[in-house]
Amino acid sequence: MNLRNSMAHGNYQEAGLMLDRMDRKDVYKKKDAVLLNLERGMIHRVNGDYQQSTLFFQKAEDDIEANFTRSISRAAASVLVNDNVLDYPGEDYEDVYLNAFKALNFIHLNDFDAALVEARRMAYKLENMELRNKGFAETYARQDSLGHADWTPGKSNIQNSAFSHYLSAVLFAKTGRPDNARIETQRVFSAMADQQAAYNFKLPPAQE
């Protein structure tokens, strides 16, 4: 049974042991540190070890930020590097949702203030994602003197996340900040109205 099958069948302890064996055999190279820590964070989470899970998610988040900074520096310096030797930078959704999992971990640990910090960090990343990617594309476009590629970033509305607003609303309410909770609740309905294709059910009245 492989790692994915172990996870799918709920054999989380076996999945953890399997991941340890894969790490010892260098299946995960140094450049795959983000991926390895994401895997470890998720396995510890589903095993109920929320502190260890948060630790590995934090390591992944730190590496994602460092790898992104290095990639910008390479682009600005016109340094071309084989993708196979680059550190895995993490996908945008991985960078965002690791904060969601950290928030849920802190909820399990009854640390609602820390959970709120993660929920707000998730919202911050989403709100700045389009701006960040635009800057990244512009940097590469300036270095592509031959115009080999179209570096125009695509359009998306991912930054308006109903889930991040909902999580923030619940945590603001839980930590005694009803005004903030009300604002975030309004944003939930706004986000769902903006992305109706993603929600195939009728929305309840906002006042509920």
Placement of each model-derived feature along the sequence:
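Residue signature of alpha-solenoid helical repeat architecture, marking inter-repeat boundaries
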Residues: K29-D32, D92-Y93, T152, N157-Q159
